[in-house]
Amino acid sequence: MFFVSAVKDYLEVLSNITDTLTGTLSFDTILKSTLLYLATSTKVFVSYIISFEWFRNISYLPIIAPDLSKAILRENYVLDTPLSNLFTFFDVPSYTSNKFVLGLLNSFFLAIPISVAHLIAFRRFIIQGLPAGLTAGLGIISGQVCFIGAVLFGVRSLVIPWFATEPLSYLIGIFLILTIIYDMAHESRIRPINLSETPLLLKIFGLSFLLTWTEQSSVFQYLANVTLGNQATLLETTTVKTDGQFLLTHISYLLGLTAGNILFTLLFGFLLLQLINQVVKFSNLPYSLCVRNLNFGILTFTLALSITSIPYYGFDYLLTAPLGFVSQDQSLEKVSLRTNLPDAIGYLGQLSESKYLDTEVTPFDRGTYLTDFATPKTYESLNYQGEYFWNSRLDRSASVTQKYRALEFNPKKDSESEIPEQVGALSPDSQANSVSPGQELSENELGLGTTKTNKQVLLNKLDQNFSRNSNPSYANLLSEVLDYSFNESFFTTSASNAPQEVALQKIEFNIKQKYYSNPLYKALLNFDIDRFISHQPVAQRLNANQEKQLFENRLILSTYYDTLRDYRLLPYSSEFQTYFNGPKSYANRVYNQQFKGTLNVVRRLFAIDIEGDSAGRSTSNSVLKFDQPLFNNFKDSSLSVYHEELNPEAVRPTKKSPFLENTSPTPFYAGWDNIQRKFIVTNRLLAREAAGNEINRASRNISSATSALTAKDYTSLGDTVKLKFTSWPDSSSKGGNSKGVNQLSLPFISVPQEKFTQVVSSLGLEDDDFGSASSTLKLPPNIKKMFEVCQISIPEVFPPKRGGFIWP
């Protein structure tokens, strides 16, 4: 592709020289042009390599690839540049259109107050008076007109260097915005600005002018392609014949933009001022209070717009922008750093395990639930506020106990000299020095009640330290192996009935009851759960009786599976069943859940009950189900995944299909293959000295997989497949079997009588095998070579497009 473009450019250079110069081209002219072209091409190529422009073009390859394909098909190898759709310099000039009116209309999109510069100008107009507002508005209009004028008149020395400094220009804009907001927020008093304060007005004009060139936090970038003209953007460009027309056309367009921008800016300012007056009138609030609130709101919204533009210039853009990439370039998606690396080992957060780190982080790392901790943490525990408030209680108590947690990370080292002080086994000297006159010491205070030696105490502390340091790893290994669908008592200890645990359970109940008794929270929770359950297809949902029957059948099947377990033979099988809450295999569950989470909160709040109400009457409500059965949306389809245990009707009727279908119009031939050393049956057009067969087959009933097999499905002895082979060549006069041979449906070629002897000799046979020469000899049409040798005309046989098959 590069070579073709280079040759085409070289030929265009020679063609232009030929059109420019009169007369014929000399060899010297062609040589000079060739050398000049090679030198220019070499310079462009070196610059292309050094500037890394090739790296940017590689990123554009997915966009250019369709254009390359179209160019190859059209035999036109000249491609458009990426900017050809943005700036069209070769449109047909329209001398009748009024560029002033077009600029006047397009200025509406420039005057919409949706940028930070417009908000600051509007604040100056309301707070600092009319002169400050008009000065700020004129600064914005001047900045917009100067920028568009520089683009229209092609002032490259100003536009290209300015955009080449990006994102430095953006940082300058952020600095200006923060400076303006800081000055406005720290004003000693809010006062209007007079016309006599010329330096301050010039400062306001300059800041507004610079903000127009630097500020990017606006909606204008999303309205850049909105224009009332026939061009792609507001940057209207036209082609004219003379320089005078060029200046007149673009100056009239700029004048229209300026006049319309002033007009629409005044219009928007007047409308906003009337809106504020109406709000003050109907709110019955003092004007000073409304102005103070408006000042705070504008400054806050301005700062918010500035902050929202920061992600546009990310760290990746700062590194890749010099290489020609844009922000959030799709070409860099596969090379970005991964932010969803899972915790494969399971030790993330173990050092701070005392704090509650089980926060919902699945949008970031797509992590799994019920892992990395010794207690189950479900989807509801991390997302429902009533459950999450209780589980994250340690986070709120961290500030109170922070001074005591320093000992956990900087533990005090134990030594043998400190052990007697810890257990109370003090030395006599220390006891005598520590006892005041008249004080009596008990046996425990004297250390007489302790029977453990210092060595035993040291070993006990070593065991405790080892157990404390080993518990996190054991908990992780246990969390990876166990399934957290055990009974709740599996995770409780013998201290669960302690007074402290009972009091803690009461506190938990009161806290959760506060959430669940809130009408708004209750309505939102019901809406969330109902929305999840309603994901099942409504048109094909089971009715209440079918759900009840299905649930009962699943319970019976689950109980039956439980009876097949080996642990049923244990003497304490009932306690085993209660403790582990049934088998742990998902295939044996009553509900095979196919979604994120376990919905244990749903089980607690919306219990499943198929027995009926409190009076024993059967309810007709639907059973709450957690599985998502699949349905067949095509009624005409014979296959269905509908619950077959609920369908009392018969299965699909049987369908007759032939035992074997021939997919080729050619007949079958059988014979011995010397290469494969086996007897084969084939439909390929292969030459055989003796080949041919007839398959008389009977149709066989092939029942569906769902129907029960009966005796009629088996083929009887009389319907067995019969294979009858006929040897070739065949004579109708041999054995008086002409009638049987003529009934064959196999194609054959009748050998003329004058060729009888030649054909028989070519086959290596004797004439006596076929009687006299007047006998009719029939041969299969696949031995075409022998017919050509004997010069026998045969009809053309077209072989099948498929290669056929060889059996066995």
Curated annotation (Swiss-Prot):
GO CC entries: chloroplast membrane
Recorded topology in the membrane: Multi-pass membrane protein
Family: Belongs to the ycf78 family.
Tree of life domain: Eukaryota
Keywords: Chloroplast, Membrane, Plastid, Transmembrane, Transmembrane helix
Membrane-traversing stretches: 35-55, 100-120, 135-155, 158-178, 193-213, 253-273, 295-315
Localization terms from the record: Plastid, Chloroplast membrane
Region ranges (Disordered): 411-447
Biased composition (Polar residues): 428-441
Name of the protein in question: Uncharacterized membrane protein ycf78
